[in-house]
């Protein structure tokens, strides 16, 4: 009896301490968010005002939710008008927006199916459906098809935007430039100005590019979240390519504040961490992509696999690195026809460094340059050729890569190496200096992160 | 009905959220464009149409000209086999389980010029129509058209019923869904299955790395814990975890404009780590002291005015110790050292037993527990158990948070809270079971000769392990927060 009384009292005493503990935990849980808010704002203050996203950021999942609402809206209209083609074209456009927002390739297929149905119902003057097909073709890296489809449509902002992207990819920078200027003249919004900035970057006109980015961000609207995050991501990568890692990081973080799972920003941040030597952090970021891409395959999967392979290799785990490379290779081979990933597969084979892969890498690049001749593609061709000891051809390929004036430390470095091997010491020195001038921090560690990012130098 | 649908949606979303967030290191999917299929379902009263675009390789025998796309002529020529093949793999049943009659027709899109068929060469599009003689209720769609040997093949499907549009992804693991008017999707079994699933998920989730299992294990083995302690620890973890998810979920909603929930996790980990370090250090200090005392006592020493018998073999729950005199002496109880200078044992010899758990009052309001004084004299204290349980449950599982937020997003807050609770119970079930196993296993160690020096060191080593784990958790959290960056970085 006495014993049970003692137990009761003891329990009461212990319970008296519980509220204090609960209150402390509750206090912490409330204090931390407030502290983090202050911290975040303090952190954001380091980002130049024009680059900050000043609108209310969308609540989690609201971007795709909004697209789902749009899908429901057009589906409902199609039910009311089953023989109409216009609503199907608009629906196809929303599907493609969904594909771009999530990176999930299935939405492209659905967009294509719907656009084709639309064209059956409305075979003429159906620009919306044609442009939806052109977008699918662009996503699949079928640039000639995309240009052809866009030329069949009445010229408008959509056709011009596709023309900028595709002309950049096939190396017709002047055509891309003209299309971008016309696009900006028609509608100087963030998306148009970002495209103009990309064209300027590909010509080495950095001031013009920065001006276009800033002008675009100044004209930013709250309803164009996709453009807002894309513009900051490529701007971040531009700073990254100039060795301004802090600025790049801030921009990526700003993007992730707006859209926490945005794959290009996560991938670019991982690239940045690899460059800094923070391999664990990079691995965490790649895992973050896996978390969001388990539902369905995405266009970013092969980049993640390659990134993981690189990280594992740098961490001194060649076995895991090989396993990840095998996955990347399997994925790239399967998508070789559908998504035109020849260049990425060639780069992977080169990264593996096996002599027996060189012939295939060259064959892939010879196929690729028939449809795509942007700076990164020509650089990859030069890489293969130089690995095979065909230095003269490699130099020709590098010259084409650099012909529009693009400034990229990695490209300059390769051009310098090729020139040096060919005995053009003075020219090599010029290239090496150009590499340092472009990115003063471009060193051995920086080279370990090459080719892991998304955007800026053409489509991935 | 709507409510049921809402609940089921939460279940589906939670399932996906769980899948996404609980298998961080799982192998990513290997599906690719050529494995993908898409479908658009138009639900009608007596007829439901499906426009299906799928890899032509699935019906390669019907692709006579081997161009990778079924032409209208090829569809007509292989009408019967296509209908049988597709009817076996994609079918709709009504509420009575009756299948609709399937007819297969080429898609209208085949009339398009080839230059407007971007996927020509890999995919074909067909129109599937399922017909019933009378209006149907409660349709179920069964989809099993996947390339063999490709476990991650998918079919993205949009479903259009009057006033309702949904999209769903079929996979080899998820081939079936019920499609009903005004209540499109829910898995068979409904709410009870969702709750049971949550429990199992929580239980399985506890087996994944984390949740303080190592720390709890080290504590329970090192200290002289009982099954009750293990249960208490499990319950504390559950309650803290549930409360943590609720608080974080609500905090996330409240502060969603300002703070990303993922930025909170490192801070919570940091606090959790500090608590663990605190527990570990206290135990370590206490046990080192007791080891010292025990070593001296083992020599059966005699003080001036009182003697203690501290034969190591008596350091069991049945130990009897003698306070020959009322001299001030020290008891050390793992978490706190208290002096008995404020109460006396007046010149009496008392021999008391220590059953599994009891407390006693010395009449001065100072209640202390002699819960299982161990051979090292370091009993498990409820306070340390509480702190340990809190530290284990303090950092809520992201999966549980996603579940709650999904529920809130769908307006089903109550069901979300219930699911989080069930999830936490599953989590606690596993943790408690593990704890009980460890406690049982510990008795095996007790049967070993206790005068072995190594055996005396076990509690101290376990305390050291706890401390190091706490330091590890805190350091990792600090690095995640970004307060500290490893050497060798630049930029």
Locate the predicted segments by residue.
Chain A
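TPR-repeat structural position
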Residues: 67, 101, 108, 143, ...
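Start-of-helix register in tetratricopeptide repeats
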Residues: 86, 93, 128, 158, ...
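Residue-level recognition of tetratricopeptide repeat
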Residues: 93, 97-100, 135, 165, ...
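Canonical tetratricopeptide repeat
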Residues: 90, 132, 162, 195, ...
């Amino acid at each position: 009896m006495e014993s049970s009384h003692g137990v009761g009292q003891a329990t009461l005493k212990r319970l008296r301490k519980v509220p204090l503990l609960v209150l402390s935990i509750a206090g912490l849980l409330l204090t931390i968010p407030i502290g983090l808010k202050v911290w975040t704002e303090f952190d954001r203050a380091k980002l130049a005002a024009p680059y900050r996203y000043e609108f209310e950021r969308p609540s989690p999942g609201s971007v795709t939710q909004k697209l789902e609402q749009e899908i429901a809206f057009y589906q409902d209209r199609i039910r009311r008008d089953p023989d109409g083609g216009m609503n199907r074209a608009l629906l196809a456009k929303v599907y493609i927006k969904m594909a771009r927002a999530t990176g999930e390739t299935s939405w492209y297929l659905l967009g294509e199916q719907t656009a084709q149905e639309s064209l059956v119902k409305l075979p003429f003057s159906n620009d919306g459906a044609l442009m939806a097909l052109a977008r699918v073709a662009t996503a699949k890296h079928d640039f000639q098809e995309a240009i052809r489809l866009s030329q069949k449509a009445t010229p408008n902002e959509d056709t011009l935007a596709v023309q900028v992207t595709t002309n950049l990819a096939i190396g017709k920078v002047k055509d891309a430039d003209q299309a971008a200027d016309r696009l900006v003249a028609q509608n100087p919004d963030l998306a148009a100005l970002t495209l103009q900035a990309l064209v300027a970057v590909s010509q080495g006109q950095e001031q013009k590019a920065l001006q276009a980015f800033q002008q675009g961000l100044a004209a930013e609207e709250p309803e164009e979240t996709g453009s807002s995050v894309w513009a900051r991501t490529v701007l971040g990568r531009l700073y990254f390519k100039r060795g301004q890692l802090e600025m790049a990081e801030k921009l990526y973080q700003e993007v992730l504040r707006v859209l926490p799972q945005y794959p290009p920003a996560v991938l670019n941040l991982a690239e940045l961490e690899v460059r800094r030597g923070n391999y664990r952090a990079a691995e965490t970021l790649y895992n973050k992509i896996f978390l969001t891409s388990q539902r369905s395959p995405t266009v970013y999967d092969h980049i993640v696999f390659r990134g993981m392979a690189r990280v594992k290799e740098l961490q001194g785990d060649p076995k895991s690195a090989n396993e990840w490379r095998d996955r990347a290779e399997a994925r790239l081979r399967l998508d070789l026809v559908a998504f035109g990933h020849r260049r990425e597969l060639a780069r992977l084979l080169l990264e593996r460094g096996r002599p027996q892969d060189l012939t295939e890498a060259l064959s892939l690049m010879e196929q690729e340059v028939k449809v795509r001749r942007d700076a990164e593609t020509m650089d990859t061709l030069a890489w293969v050729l130089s690995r095979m000891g065909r230095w003269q051809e490699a130099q020709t390929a590098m010259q084409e890569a650099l012909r529009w004036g693009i400034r990229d430390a990695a490209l300059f470095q390769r051009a310098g190496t090729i020139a040096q091997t060919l005995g053009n010491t003075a020219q090599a020195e010029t290239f090496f200096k150009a590499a340092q001038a472009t990115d003063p921090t471009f060193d051995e560690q920086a080279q370990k992160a090459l080719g892991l990012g998304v955007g800026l130098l053409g489509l991935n | 009905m709507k409510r049921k649908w809402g609940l089921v949606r939460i279940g589906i979303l939670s399932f996906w959220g769980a899948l996404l967030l609980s298998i961080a290191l799982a192998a990513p999917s290997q599906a690719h464009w050529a494995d993908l299929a898409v479908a658009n379902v138009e639900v009608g009263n007596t007829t439901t149409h499906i426009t299906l675009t799928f890899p032509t390789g699935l019906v390669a025998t019907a692709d006579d000209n081997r161009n990778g796309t079924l032409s209208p002529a090829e569809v007509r020529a292989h009408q019967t086999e296509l209908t049988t093949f597709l009817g076996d793999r994609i079918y709709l049943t009504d509420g009575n389980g009756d299948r609709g009659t399937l007819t297969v027709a080429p898609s209208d899109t085949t009339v398009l010029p080839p230059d407007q068929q971007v996927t020509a060469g890999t995919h074909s599009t067909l129109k599937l129509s399922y017909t019933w003689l009378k209006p149907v209720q409660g349709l179920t769609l069964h989809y099993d058209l996947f390339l063999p040997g490709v476990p991650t093949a998918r079919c993205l499907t949009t479903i259009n019923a009057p006033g309702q549009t949904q999209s769903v992804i079929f996979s080899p693991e998820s081939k079936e869904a019920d499609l009903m008017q005004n209540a499109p999707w829910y898995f068979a079994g409904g709410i009870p299955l969702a709750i049971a699933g949550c429990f199992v998920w929580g239980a399985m989730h506890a087996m994944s790395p984390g949740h303080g299992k190592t720390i709890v294990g080290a504590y329970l083995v090192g200290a002289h814990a009982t099954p009750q302690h293990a249960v208490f620890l499990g319950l504390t973890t559950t309650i803290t975890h549930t409360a943590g998810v609720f608080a974080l979920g609500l905090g996330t909603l409240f502060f969603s404009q300002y703070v990303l929930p993922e930025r909170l996790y490192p801070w919570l980990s940091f606090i959790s780590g500090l608590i663990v370090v605190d527990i570990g250090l206290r135990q370590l200090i206490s046990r080192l002291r007791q080891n010292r005392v025990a070593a001296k006592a083992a020599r059966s020493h005699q003080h001036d005015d009182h003697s203690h018998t501290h034969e190591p073999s008596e350091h069991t729950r049945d130990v009897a110790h003698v306070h020959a005199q009322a001299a001030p002496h020290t008891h050390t109880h793992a978490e706190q050292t208290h002096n008995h200078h404020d109460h006396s044992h007046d010149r009496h010899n008392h021999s008391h037993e220590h059953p599994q758990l009891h407390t006693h009052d010395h009449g001065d309001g100072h209640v202390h527990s002699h819960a299982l004084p161990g051979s090292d004299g370091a009993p498990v204290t409820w306070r340390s158990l509480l702190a340990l349980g809190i530290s284990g449950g303090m950092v809520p599982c992201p999966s549980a948070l996603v579940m709650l937020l999904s529920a809130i997003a769908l307006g089903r807050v109550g069901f979300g809270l219930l699911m989080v609770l069930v999830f936490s119970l599953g989590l606690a079930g596993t943790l408690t079971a593990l704890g009980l196993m460890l406690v049982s296993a510990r008795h095996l160690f007790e049967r070993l000769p206790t005068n072995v020096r190594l055996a005396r060191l076990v509690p101290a080593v376990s305390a050291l392990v706890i401390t190091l784990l706490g330091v590890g958790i805190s350091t990792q959290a600090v690095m995640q927060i970004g307060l500290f960056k490893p050497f060798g970085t630049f930029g």
